[in-house]
Every structure is written in structure tokens, then in C-alpha cells.
Amino acid sequence: MGGAVSAGEDNDDLIDNLKEAQYIRTERVEQAFRAIDRGDYYLEGYRDNAYKDLAWKHGNIHLSAPCIYSEVMEALKLQPGLSFLNLGSGTGYLSTMVGLILGPFGINHGIELHSDVVEYAKEKLESFIKNSDSFDKFEFCEPAFVVGNCLQIASDSHQYDRIYCGAGVQKDHENYMKILLKVGGILVMPIEDQLTQIMRTGQNTWESKNILAVSFAPLVQPSKNDNGKPDSVGLPPCAVRNLQDLARIYIRRTLRNFINDEMQAKGIPQRAPPKRKRKRVKQRINTYVFVGNQLIPQPLDSEEDEKMEEDKEEEEKEPGEALKPEEPPQNLLREKIMKLPLPESLKAYLTYFREK
């Protein structure tokens, strides 16, 4: 069964396919998707499925199809410094990509029903910060996750510039979601089988646009306590960064700008050239249904369509192009930090205690 786009061989290949099918349309969203390897959020033994345009579920752990996340990221129209709330934050994959766009002065909160999934998300977040080659290339708004039902958020909670809900919202909960949004903000959620973008244009005015026909599992209704009322859930605080943290942000920013100026002066491109890839002919598909635990695009490709696609795949090669062994990525920011005349403990702090 085919997806909305062809399966990729790796994360970059998947992103190339999403771009070709016009699911990813802006450079900012593309950079975030390339920086976070979707395969890192899969359990061991399931990673082979990470680069297919399909949803994945194992127990309470769930990832939506890449084309869904692409549409969500584009519809949110994220900007640095905004506040974001992820209702049903799951593995933290989407929240981490959002954090790369929000930058260090944004707010990035997530609420997730299952405590084991929150622990999984925190582990994946720590792994990204400590191990990812992408981390030092961005200024990051680290997500903060809490356990709870998103229909039980305390009434005195703050509002957000951008909100995404990753479960089907019933019509009678629509206004509840809207109240969490600031004037001028954008809410993206599945409602009545449509992934919908809602913009708050005034205190009591809204503009809605359907993005995609989808079928999401509905929000879990809150359970009641002994008093017959559901317990309220407090969202993370909107904390102000301390001076030590601000110093780290600005030192890293200054060094990163210095590196960029050096590279520009030497005529060194700051981005790797695009990968040569196979030609594919694939139709964009805008309807999705759940089959078991998988979100499957409809209509499905026939065997004849798949054979035609395979026949059209050709490797594009540059003239004289030869295979070269891959060199380990060079972390110029880390090198600059390590040359600073500072105690080793401060250097470790500036690198977020990363070892690479």
C-alpha cells in the first residue's frame, strides 16, 4: 500500500519527497524537519518503518504520518519568540521541531495523557540535546512536558500564540480549545474529520480554514474524582531565563555568527549541497483513514501504479561523480568554545555538557 509520498531511504530522503509533493513548502519548516531524525523517535526494531509516510503506534507511543506533521507545521506559521502549546504531545517529535523555530525566547509546552509517554519524550529530548549533530546549528526552545488530560487544563492558565491538538476534537469542545488561544494566534486541530486552521482575529471573532481530510482517534474524556468533578491540570510556568542562561545563549550566538562570517569570507557554503536522488512520479493524496493502528492515505496505489513508479526511478549522477567515504561532521561551534580562555566547567556548560 502506498503513502501520500514515496518512502525514503533516510530522513533527508523522506524530506525531499515531502517537498516534491508540496507538503513542506517553506525553508524554515524544511530545516526543522531535516534537523530532527524521525527514526530517532522509533523503538529499536521498528526504525525501518520510520521513513515511510505512515503513522506508527506501539502501546501508548504514537507518531502521525510525516505528511500530517508537515501540514501542521506549515499551518502553524511559526516565528521565533512565540508561545506554543501541544495538546497530546506524545513522543515530543513535533515539539522538538517547533523548538528549533521558536528559538531561546519562545515558550514550548506540551501536555500528554500517558505518564510513560512523557518519560519517553523526555528521554528523546535529552538524547537530542546531548547527541544530535543538529543541536549546535540552532537556537533552541526546549519543550516542557506535563502529564494530564488536555480537557482538564486549569481555567486560569495562560494563553498561547500557537496551539496544536493531535487528537480528534468534538464540536462541543471547540470553544474550550479556542479560549486557550491569544488574539492573533493560530490553532490547528482535527475537527469533524478535517484538519482545521483557526485564527483568532479578535476577542470574539475567528477565521477557519480546512487543510486536509483526516480521521483521528478522539480525545479521551476526563475521569472524575470523588467529588464528581475532574481534577484540573496545571501547565508549565512561563519562566524567565536567568542571567547565566542568557549569557550562554549570547556567547553561543556570537560565536555562531563569527563562524558564519568566517565561512562567508572564505567562500565556503554554509549548507551542504542537496543530495542527488531518484526521480519519482507520485500524486498528492488528501484523504486519510485509520486501518488498525495505521493512518493510511486513500486512495491506495494499485500494483500497476507501483510498478510504473519503480520503472520511472532513475539515479541522477553528476558527470564524473565518484563515491567518497563520508567524513565525520565538523562541529565548529564546539571547537570555538573549547578554545575560549575559560575553566573547563564553564566550557562544559556552554556546550550543554555535550561530548561531541
Curated annotation (Swiss-Prot):
Basic and acidic residues: compositionally biased ranges: 319-331
Residue span of region AdoMet binding motif: 85-94, 160-164, 181-191
Domain of life of the source: Eukaryota
Active site: 64
Its membrane topology: Lipid-anchor
Keyword check for Cytoplasm: yes
Pfam family, one: PCMT
Region (BC-box): 240-250
Cellular component GO terms, alphabetical: Cul5-RING ubiquitin ligase complex; cytoplasm; membrane
Record field: compositional bias (Acidic residues): 301-318
InterPro entries cross-referenced by the UniProt entry: PCMT, SAM-dependent_MTases_sf
UniProt entry keywords in alphabetical sequence: Cytoplasm, Lipoprotein, Membrane, Myristate
GO molecular function: protein-L-isoaspartate (D-aspartate) O-methyltransferase activity; ubiquitin-like ligase-substrate adaptor activity
Subunit structure: Component of the probable ECS(PCMTD1) E3 ubiquitin-protein ligase complex, at least composed of CUL5, ELOB, ELOC, RBX2 and PCMTD1. Interacts (via the BC-box) with ELOB and ELOC; the interaction is direct and stabilizes PCMTD1.
Entry domain remark: At its N-terminus, contains L-isoaspartate and S-adenosylmethionine (AdoMet) binding motifs. Also contains an extended SOCS box motif, where the Cul-box is separated from the BC-box by ~90 residues, within its C-terminus.
Its job: Substrate recognition component of an ECS (Elongin BC-CUL5-SOCS-box protein) E3 ubiquitin ligase complex which mediates the ubiquitination and subsequent proteasomal degradation of target proteins. Specifically binds to the methyltransferase cofactor S-adenosylmethionine (AdoMet) via the N-terminal AdoMet binding motif, but does not display methyltransferase activity. May provide an alternate maintenance pathway for modified proteins by acting as a damage-specific E3 ubiquitin ligase adaptor protein.
Protein name: Protein-L-isoaspartate O-methyltransferase domain-containing protein 1
